[in-house]
Amino acid sequence: MPKVLIVHDYLNQVGGGEKVLELLLKLFINAEVYTLTWDRKLFPKINPKTSFIQFIPLKKRYRAYMPLFPTAVKLLKIPENSLILSSSHAYIKNIIKPKNSLHICYCLTPMRYAWDSRSEYLKRENVFLRPFIALFLAYLRHWDKKGSENVDYFIAIS
């Protein structure tokens, strides 16, 4: 029997995606949870495996660490022979799928700031940082497209 893993972008805010995660945890009570960063106060009943982002100071300003998120996802070690259920709106669906594993992604929404809303996103950023952010978003689109090829099945709600 494969080990069930639930992977979620980050657990530092409460929203619709986190409600989906709670439902998945009710369905798969023995599942292990993986995430990039976790706020214990918001999610005291979940004890996830986290990325190195968890240990960076000023986690509340996680947007400043966005360029590190693809590397953080890549470095999360997933055991072989796993059933990976990702609940994702951004990064975690690109987790590296090990041998003999199945990855089903419950895609909450595409990474809109990298795809269809990038011009609106850039308008809100510092004018001097925009060229660098635009380059990062181009890289992110490439990484997102390539990473989605490792998902076996998508379930989309948005």
Where do the protein language model's features map onto the residues?
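Active-site donor-binding segments of glycosyltransferases and PAPS-dependent sulfotransferases
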Residues: 27-93
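Membrane-proximal helix-turn-helix segments that form the acceptor-binding/catalytic region
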Residues: 123, 129-154
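Short, basic, glycine/proline-bearing loop/turn elements
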Residues: 5-8, 56-61, 125-133
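Short catalytic/ligand-binding loop motif for oxyanion handling, primarily in non-cytosolic enzymes
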Residues: 13, 41-43, 92-96, 112-115
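Short amphipathic alpha-helix
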Residues: 17-27
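Active-site proximal beta-strand in glycosyltransferases
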Residues: 83-85, 97-126
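Nucleotide-activated donor-dependent transferases that construct or modify glycoconjugates
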Residues: 2-12, 36-37
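Helix N-cap/beta->alpha junction signal
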Residues: 88-89, 109, 155-158
